[in-house]
């Protein structure tokens, strides 16, 4: 029995998140249902990240044991895509070592967050960007983001329900102005707490609006108190972009 990994993209709009749950539609659920149709047995998968409801992915990485050694990776990819709904797509399948685990073996996770700052709403993008029709000072946001890079206790940027170790490492945060009034916030790190990226985005927007000085970010980080930070940016602007391992 060989072990394979698959790079998956999905539109999170109509999912209750990635992780399988009873009685609701999840990304893991539809993937494992597709695998069961292919292999005539339940196949359990592991993933590099558990995205929340409404969050999208360009490069989610999953792994599972394939019970049919005669199938090539291209065969597996084609079979999965033939059995998946049209809001999930397998981009690539490749063999990995027997003990590979995408959650623990990934060295870097990259998230993208898109903000649309145009005065007029774009109804076609309403599920895919955060429409925020205000001017943002990106230079101030970049200065604030520097305080978050490195290894820190990110208690101020986690949800109260996340009991994991709050110490995390952010390698880099880039903030770019794209065409058509789009702003991209790219966050690179080894691993993240639940809603950590969205909470960081909300805080950076406070700086961009000049409601906070860039130095406020250091103060919020050191407070280690969720109430010291801003709210949470909407889920639909966030994309699990890529993993490196």
UniProtKB/Swiss-Prot annotation:
Pfam families (alphabetical): PseudoU_synth_1
Record-listed substrate binding positions: 111
GO biological process terms held by the UniProt record: tRNA pseudouridine synthesis
Record keywords, A-Z: Isomerase, tRNA processing
SUPFAM superfamilies linked to this entry: Pseudouridine synthase (SSF55120)
Catalysed reaction, written as an equation: uridine(38/39/40) in tRNA = pseudouridine(38/39/40) in tRNA
Cross-referenced InterPro entries: PsdUridine_synth_cat_dom_sf (IPR020103), PsdUridine_synth_TruA (IPR001406), PsdUridine_synth_TruA_a/b_dom (IPR020097), PsdUridine_synth_TruA_C (IPR020095), TruA/RsuA/RluB/E/F_N (IPR020094)
Single GO term (MF): tRNA pseudouridine(38-40) synthase activity
UniProt xrefs under NCBIfam families: hisT_truA
Function: Formation of pseudouridine at positions 38, 39 and 40 in the anticodon stem and loop of transfer RNAs.
HAMAP family the record matches: TruA
The protein, known as: tRNA pseudouridine synthase A
The species this protein was found in: Thermotoga sp. (strain RQ2)
């Amino acid at each position: 029995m060989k072990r394979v990994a698959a790079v998956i993209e999905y539109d999170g709009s109509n999912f209750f998140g990635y992780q399988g749950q009873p009685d609701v539609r999840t990304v893991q659920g539809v993937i494992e249902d597709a695998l069961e149709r292919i292999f005539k047995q339940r196949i359990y998968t592991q993933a590099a990240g558990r995205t929340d409801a409404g969050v999208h992915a360009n490069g989610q990485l999953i792994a599972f044991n394939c019970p049919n050694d005669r199938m090539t990776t291209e065969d597996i990819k084609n079979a999965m895509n033939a059995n998946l709904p049209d809001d999930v797509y397998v981009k690539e399948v490749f063999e990995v070592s027997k003990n590979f685990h995408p959650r623990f073996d990934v060295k870097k996770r990259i998230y993208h967050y898109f903000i649309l700052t145009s005065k007029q709403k774009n109804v076609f993008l309403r599920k895919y960007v955060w429409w925020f029709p205000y001017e943002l000072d990106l230079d101030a946001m970049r200065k604030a983001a520097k305080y978050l890079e490195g290894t820190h206790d990110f208690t101020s940027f986690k949800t109260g329900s996340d009991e994991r170790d709050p110490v995390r490492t952010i390698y880099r945060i880039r903030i770019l102005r794209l065409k058509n009034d789009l702003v991209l916030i790219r966050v690179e790190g080894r691993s993240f707490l639940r809603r950590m990226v969205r909470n960081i985005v909300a805080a950076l927007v406070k700086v961009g609006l000049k409601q906070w000085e860039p130095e406020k970010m250091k103060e919020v980080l050191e407070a280690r108190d969720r109430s010291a930070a801003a709210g949470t940016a909407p889920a639909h602007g966030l994309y699990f972009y890529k993993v490196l391992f």
